Structure formats: structure tokens, C-alpha cells
């Protein structure tokens, strides 16, 4: 494992998803899933999210579209919050989901719009 890249990834992960969310995920690490968490931090968040060629806002926008298409509701919730943290507006999220509708199908968009509204409501309630 590249410890420097792992640490960089962990820092980015906390900045995007929130320190509380990441710390909660890490407190559930055991010998079975530790290698996966290391991979997640080093490769996903360090090696890819840590690249300079795309800003975090753009990466978040891409993630919303891809995760919507893959029908991963838990991850969509997490990344919608991260996208807002990275400066993606609610209007931009709506437009991403409109694009999902025409290229990936209405069922994917219906679920994603519902999840986005739930996330917005949760945030608005504090």
C-alpha cells in the first residue's frame, strides 16, 4: 500500500463526504473489510479523486449520473451530499438527472429524483 496516497485519499474522502460520515464508516472496519477500505482510500479517493485534471465539482457531477444509472441508492445519497459540498447546485443536480432520464431511462431517473428530494429535505430540516 502507498501510505502517502492512502492518506491523501482519506483527506479528500473526508472533505467530500464529511468527516462524520467517513469516521462512522471506518469505525466498522474489521479484518475482513480493512483491505477494501484501504483500496477505497488509496485508489478511489487518492489516485483518482486526487488527480488535478478535473475539479471535484465535475467529478461529483459525473458520479451522480453514473451512480443513478447503476441504481445504487445508498451511494447516490452519499454522493448527492458530497456534490452539494463540492459546489454542485440543486439546479445542476436536476439537470444531471434529466440527462440520466433520456440516456439511461425513466426508471433510473424516477428513483434518483425521489432520492435527491429526500436528501434536500433532510438537509433543509438540518
PLM region spans:
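Acidic, glycine/proline-rich low-complexity segments that act as flexible tails and inter-domain linkers
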Residues: 1-57, 85, 110-126
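A general alpha-helix detector
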Residues: 8, 12, 44, 61, ...
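A short structural micro-motif
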Residues: 31-32, 68-69, 86, 99-106
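Short amphipathic alpha-helical segments at helix boundaries and their inter-helical linkers
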Residues: 36-38, 72-79, 100-115
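Short alpha-helical scaffolding segments that buttress acidic/His motifs in well-ordered protein cores
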Residues: 40-44, 61-68, 96-101, 112
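Mid-chain, well-packed structural core segment of small domains
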Residues: 61-94
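Residues forming well-ordered secondary-structure scaffolds
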Residues: 91-95, 108-111
Amino acid at each position: 500500500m502507498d501510505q502517502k496516497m492512502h492518506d491523501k485519499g482519506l483527506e479528500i474522502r473526508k472533505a467530500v463526504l464529511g468527516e462524520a460520515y467517513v469516521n462512522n464508516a471506518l469505525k466498522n472496519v474489521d479484518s475482513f473489510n480493512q483491505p477494501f477500505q484501504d483500496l477505497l482510500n488509496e485508489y478511489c479517493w487518492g489516485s483518482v479523486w486526487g488527480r488535478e485534471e478535473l475539479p471535484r465539482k465535475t467529478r461529483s457531477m459525473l458520479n451522480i449520473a453514473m451512480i443513478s444509472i447503476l441504481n445504487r441508492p445508498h451511494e447516490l445519497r452519499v454522493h448527492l451530499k458530497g456534490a452539494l459540498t463540492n459546489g454542485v447546485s440543486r439546479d445542476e443536480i436536476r439537470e444531471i438527472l434529466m440527462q440520466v432520464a433520456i440516456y439511461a431511462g425513466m426508471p433510473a431517473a424516477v428513483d434518483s429524483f425521489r432520492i435527491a428530494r429526500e436528501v434536500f429535505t433532510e438537509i433543509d430540516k438540518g
